[in-house]
Structures are given as C-alpha cells and as structure tokens.
Amino acid sequence: MHSREIRQSFLDFFAAKSHTIVRSAPVIPADDPTLLFTNAGMNQFKDVFLAKGTRPYTRAADTQKCIRASGKHNDLEDVGRDTYHHTFFEMLGNWSFGDYYKEEAISWAWELLTEVWKLPADRLYATVYHDDDESARIWAEKTSIEPSHILRFGDKDNFWEMGETGPCGPCSEIHIDLTPDGSGKELVNAGDHRAIELWNLVFIQYDRQPDGRLEPLPQRHVDTGMGFERVCAVMQSKASNYDTDVFLPLFQRLSELTGVTYGASMDGRQDIAMRVIADHARTLTFALSDGAMPSNEGRGYVLRRILRRALRYSRDLGCSGPILHQLVGTLADSMGDVFGELRDRRDAVERIIRAEEESFITTLDRGMEIFGELAAATARAGGRMLKGEDAFKLYDTYGFPFDLTRLLATEAGLDVDGEGFEHCMQEQKSRARSDRREKQQTGDGAGSWQWFSDSHATTFLGYDRLAMPSTIIGAAHASGHLLLVLAETPFYAESGGQTGDRGWLESAAYRMQVTDTRKDGDSFVHVVSRAFDKVRDTEIDPMDIVIEEATPVDASVERILRQETERNHTATHLLHAALRRILGSHVQQKGSFVTSERLRFDFSHFSKMTPEEIQAVEAEVNEHIRCAAHVSKHADLPYDEAIAKGALAFFGDKYAERVRMVEVPGISAELCGGTHVDNIGQIGIFKIISESSAAAGIRRIEALTGRAAEMLLWKEYHELQDVRQQLKLKADEAVAEKLAELQEEKKELEKELAGLKSASVIDALVRDATSAEEIGGCRIVTKVLEGVDADTLRSAAMALREKLPVSAGLLCSIADGKVSLAAFSSDVAVKEKGIDAGKLIRLAAAAVKGGGGGRAELATAGGKNPDGVAEACRIFAEDVRRIAGAV
C-alpha cells in the first residue's frame, strides 16, 4: 500500500464515521505563544480542551504536520544516528469534543488496524492505565484482541497531561510486535524498536487542580495520534521509516546529486548523512512554506541550526556547495497534492534555503579548519574536552550551533565543555542587557530623582491632544539636561521604533525646550536641553533650574514635527503590506526607526530586492496613498479580537491581553501603539531612497514621505536639468544614452592613451637596453618602472625579446602598493643558453613575497612587498649571469 493510499484510507475511514476532515494546521502556531512549532495533532484544538473555544463540529480527523526540534520534544540530535527519529513527521489523528468516548475510539481503532489495514491481530498489544478498568473491559469485550495482550502501566506510560494543571486523563496505546518469532510482549513500553507504539488513544476526562486533585470535566474528549511514517513502515514491511516510499524520492534525488546510493555505504556514515539531509530538508521546506524564516532567535534560529547541521552532513556525501534547496522541488512533487503550500511556495522556499546555504558555506569551511586546529591542540595536550570558550568562539564567530560543535567533537573522539559554553553565552547576554540599559538611560551621570507623587506613572493623552496643562511629578539632572516626568502628557515617548516627541514645557518661571521624550518603565521622561528665564528674559542652563513640588506646566508638542513623524509611521504600515504582497508572506517586520525626517524599515527577506521589485513596492504604496483611505485606530481591543480582525502578530513579539490596532481597511492591520495620520492621503508622497542588507536574511529600506520626499524629488529634478544643460541635450534626447556614448568615447581615448604610453615606455627601454650588461653574448635587462600596469609591463617584455635577439630581462612595476613582474628570454637565449624565464621569475618573485610563472620565453608574477623589488632584480640578474656565463 502506497503511503498516499495509507493516509487517504485513514481519512476516508473516519469520514465514514461522521468525522469532519480538517486541514493540517501550519507548523508555525498562529496564536499559541507557548510553542515554537506545532508538535502534535492536538495543538490546533488546545482551546477546545481548555474550554476557551469551540468548533462547528464535534468529531474531527486530520493529518497534522509536526516538528519536534526544540524544548522537551526534541529529536534533533538523534536524527540520522538511528532509523526512526525525525524532526518533521505527520501525525494522523481523530478527535471527539464531548461526543463519543472510549468504546467508539477503541473499537474504531481496532477496526481500522485489523479489518481495513489487515494488520495481524496476534501481533498487536493494547496498554491501559493501571486503574482504567473501563478501557480494559472495552478492549476485552468489544475487540478480538487476545486477553493476554491487554497490558497495564502507570502514570509514566499511560496517563496524559497537558501541563502541571488542566485537562488530563488516561490513555490506551496500541503497540505492534515486530520480533521474528512474536516474542515481543516484554518489550512493550521498554523503548525497544522491535515492539513499537502505533497509536495513542487519549481519554481527556479530568481537570488537574493546583493541589494535585483530579476533578471530572463537564465534557469528556478523545484525542488520538498515530505516527504516519511509522505506520507506513509497518504496512510496507520495511525495516525502518526511512525505507518507505515517504523518503524514497528524496534519497533518489540525493543520489542523482551526489552519486551516493542509500544503503550502499560500508561504514554507514553516508547513510546517516542521507537520513539527516532528507529529514532536515523536510523540516525546512514545511516550516518555510508555512511562513517561518531562518534568523538568529527563536524558531528562526532552530531552523538555521537544522540547515547548518544538514550542510555539515552533506560534506560526508562529497558536497562542497549548496544542495538542500535542490530537494524542495522533490518534496513539492511528492507531497504537494496533500499539502498545497509546498507547490505554492516552492520558488520562494528554494531561494530562501539557497541563500542560507551560500551564506554559511564560507564560514563552514573556515570554522571546520578552526575546529580541526582546536581539536588537534586539545589532543596534543592530552585532553579529551574541548574548552567551552572555544565552542563559543565557533558559535559567535563562525555561526556554529553548539550541537554542531558537539557533533564534530564526537566524531573526533572528544567531549565539549557545555557548562563553559553556557557561561560564555550568559556573559554575552549580560553584556547585551547592560548595553541596552545604558541606551535606555535618560543621560549619563543622572542624579537621584526627586519625586513629588507616590505614583511615577505618566498618562499619555497625545493620541488626541498636542497641548495640555499638566503637573511635574518627578525631576532629575543629567549631563547638562533637565529631566522631567509629568502626571499627564501629550508627548509620545520613544517606543515601537518611533522617536520621542519634541516641543515645549512652560511654567510660571521658565520656558523649557524638550528635545526628546523617553520611556523609563511607566514614566515618560521629557529631556530639556534649553531653558529660558521668563522673568529675566534670558537663556539659562537647564542644570540650574530647581523644580518645586507640584509645579504646573503647559505642555505643547511641535505640531509639524509630530505630523511628519506620523506620515512616516503610517507609511511603514503601508510599506509592510506592500512588501508582503509583492515579495511574499514570509516578509515580517524585524525593526523600524521612524523620525520626522525619514523612516527605516527592516524586514525578513532572503535576497537583495531587484529594481523592479523596489519600483513595484513604491508604486503600490503611492497608489494606496492616492486612495486617501481613512485610518482606523482601535484602542483597547482584546488581543484575540484584533487577530480575528486580521491584525498581524508574530511569534516572539509580546502582546498584552488588550491591544491597540491601527487599520487601513483592506490594506493593512497591525498592533501598534504609535501615532498615525487620520487619512493616508495626508502622507502625500512615498519615496524609497535605499535598499540594503541589515543582517543575514534581513533587508533594510529607507524612505521619505511628505515634504522631505518632495524636496528630494525637486533636488533630483534640478540636478538632472543641470546635467542636460551641460551635455547640451535636446528635449527628445535621453541622458542615459548620452552618458553611455560619452563613456564609450572615454574608453576609446583611454585605450589610445595607454597604447601611446606603452609605445613610449618600450622605446625608452630599447634605447637603454643597448647599453645593458652583457654576459656570454647575452644582454641582461632589469628595470623598475613606476605606475605602469601589468599589461603594459608584459607588452614591454614581449617587445624587448623581439628587439634584442640574445637577451633576458626582468621588468618590475609598483602601483597601489602592489608589485608586478614580467620576465622574458629571447628565442636564442632559451635555445642556446638555456635561460628559462618561467623558472627564474619564480625565484625572483620570492623577494617581493609573491609568486607566478609562465613559459620559458615569457612569464609574469605579482607580489605585495615593494621594498623587495631591488632584491628581485638582483636575484634575476645573478641567475642569468650564472647560466649565460657557464655556456
């Protein structure tokens, strides 16, 4: 039975039992911050089990894509070393939400296994929880299983719990005996691959209380899971999951790419490599197809670790270049009919993986060299343990995940100091936290705060007001600045990438200029850098101002600066939406910086944007701006409601239970606490001024809006007009064509000039050579020329050997700190004297710390030591004298 048929027969079986066949949830959980990856079939129904959600059906079945590569469910380091661990797998499952219970679940499982799939009943065992008499009775009375094959186990094996508290219940597992003689009873639940679990039937009937008590649930549920690859191996009578047709297309493609056949290696090393690569290619392809991106944190780093681990194993197959991306199409072809996203995202996933491979290959080579040196040094010192700081260096400098270093160490017969590595990691994190704290401080050397209120919190009212009265509740001085905290403020404090507002605070005695507003916990700190004494009508040092308790002030934000900032902030939302539509849904915001002057937006993407893509994004944003749509700001929404309305939220971002959503209907919806325009038409113009790399896998766009964009366009227009005037272009003549024409003329003139220069150099050399030293009838020419390029030098050498019938020489040139050498030997000198320019130039080049070679008649070399040129000439001349004088 083909794997495709096995999967479909499972779904058909439960569809006939009135189950709704649901789609697999993405392997990237959309609304569960506790998970990096979907790791079980029940994940998408977790809210039902927790009584926080419902479904329009009470019976369901599916095949769920799962990844187990992090946390307690982590099979990563076992993959490849055996034949049954995977980081990606499918989980077949059926569920009852307060509908049927144990009897139906057990009876149907037995029916599918023995009557539909025809598995031998005498090889099947059912395990039950030690005091679950109900399940044991159902197995005995409602199925044909042998009574002696009903086995009881305790909490460890047969009691399922979602967490320390919450839904839980007994489970019943179905195992199959794969021993040759059917003697596997004692191997059940013993971790032996000869008696493996096929199917786990979980009966959720209790609610675990904080004190450990089990309270009956008002509704009982069924949650079952069966490993698809494992059941395929059993159904197809294969020795392992990797021998099934699930993996066959991948192994065939790997064989085409590497010339290595799975199962043919003598020591098993290449088989391990093929298993690792096949498994990891599946994980990467499915994860990226569901919107994940490799990165340096969270799930992105797990994927990067997996990719780099696979690349390391590809070396065991003789691969030195990218290979993983070439398996994406194989998966799309073999599994795309079931998981359509593999076909839909094929091209994008291939590009992402290839870019990651190419990025790591160079550092992999260098890192492998460094590891080899460290391992050799450890062995020479009689040690068996690689230092933690060395492992951290490989991680920090060459991108080697710790598990990759540990793998290499194991292969070299070494251990790695994991505690030392972790210590280095924590030290780096501490330094980073310290740096962040320093950046968040309102000023160096800030004195102690003087507080006039028990509460240090500021209420922000600046969404609707730019000016208002308030009261100072805190004050401090730091590095020439006065720092003030107000009870209420219209000033936006820097956060979410948006810079703090600027403006004025005015008390009865002082007028104070606020040049920045920053957050410090719940306090909004207004940074005063200039102040004026209203009584004396003079400017004073902010450090000299003494704030009295409960000082009232009028706070006013610079309106124009705020409006320009709002234009740029709303533009980042439009830009994000356009990037996701044009480049793909893998695009996620990775950072932003919004000021009144410009905006900067960092986003996940695997390659440099083409000019066409940049133009398309810019055009789409401007098209939206021209639509002049209203911007809706939904304050204090429940998080779930905001997500239901389509707001973007990404794993790793922290959100409160109640959020603020900024929406441009039909275009963009994001969770955002920043300030925005009321209508996107107010943005005016959007102009991208640069696109660059911010980090591996992260691109950066800088752009202008409003007046700044308008001024840039006017500046560029006037510069273009100046160029047209200088080029004396007619109205219908294009600047680019004229410049190309001028550049071509310039090249021709440079070529002509180089020819004249070369001829001049050659003429001078020939004149000088007539008086050169002569030994044994052979002229010896050595000459150092300043600023002559290598081509001219070579041409001069060729001319001299033609002009001087019996001669040998070395010409040298120094340009930009580099040395070029050209040696020649005339035909007579080669044939009758045995003077070989190719051999002699190699000896001379050593003096300039270089190398080279060529024919006996003509040879070239280069070097990086200009101070050695005289010595090179001396060596060459001495060698020619020796050879010519001996003939």
Swiss-Prot record:
PROSITE patterns: AA_TRNA_LIGASE_II_ALA (PS50860)
Gene3D superfamilies named in the record: 2.40.30.130, 3.10.310.40, 3.30.54.20, Bira Bifunctional Protein, Domain 2, Threonyl-trna Synthetase, Chain A, domain 2
Cofactor section: Zn(2+)
Family affiliation: Belongs to the class-II aminoacyl-tRNA synthetase family.
Domain of life: Bacteria
Role description: Catalyzes the attachment of alanine to tRNA(Ala) in a two-step reaction: alanine is first activated by ATP to form Ala-AMP and then transferred to the acceptor end of tRNA(Ala). Also edits incorrectly charged Ser-tRNA(Ala) and Gly-tRNA(Ala) via its editing domain.
SMART domains: tRNA_SAD (SM00863)
Keywords, in A-Z order: Aminoacyl-tRNA synthetase, ATP-binding, Cytoplasm, Ligase, Metal-binding, Nucleotide-binding, Protein biosynthesis, RNA-binding, tRNA-binding, Zinc
SUPFAM superfamilies attached to this UniProt entry: Class II aaRS and biotin synthetases, Putative anticodon-binding domain of alanyl-tRNA synthetase (AlaRS), ThrRS/AlaRS common domain, Translation proteins
Protein name: Alanine--tRNA ligase
Any one Gene Ontology BP term: alanyl-tRNA aminoacylation
Primary localization: cytoplasm
GO molecular function ontology, one term from the record: tRNA binding
Subcellular localization: Cytoplasm
Record HAMAP family: Ala_tRNA_synth_B
Binding annotation for Zn(2+): 569, 573, 672, 676
